[in-house]
Amino acid sequence: MFPLHLVLIPIIPLLLLVSHNVDIVSLQDVFLPFLILVSVAIFFQATISRFFKSKAKVALVISWFYILFFSYGHIHGYLNQIMGSSILELAVQNRYLVPIFGILFLLGSFCVLKIKKILDVLTKFVNVWAVVMVSILLFNIVSYVISGFLQQEKILGLEIEPKDIEISKSLPDIYY
């Protein structure tokens, strides 16, 4: 099975940002980051695949890295929010959280690479998850764009023509 998640998972955060800021961001602004994210994922796949036999396992490791990488800031912010006092904030400093994420990455990578079975089921699951996430985000973006076009069309359809304006011959008495 083709690891479609290798291309889709890196663009999920980009699409998420676009879907929350669709009124501000143009498609030209999204193209370059999209190209960079996808080409870096493909570069990692091509480079790391030289050292391992299974390209599907390497794709899962790269996807695992992207998931951890893009979720780090959210988890860090959430933990800071939970532990509000200055004493407890020591638990969520980067020097403590980065090693935890590093260990999570190494454990996940080790498990994926050392499993003797072919990971078709896991690849299918991650592919379906990535397709669903991208589909939801694209649906949000497209529905907003379409609703914007419909609102523009409605506004343009209600324009007042100069011939529709009635000009009164008698001026109002503003001085009483």
For each predicted feature, which ranges?
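Soluble catalytic regions of membrane-associated enzymes that act on cell-envelope
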Residues: 153-176
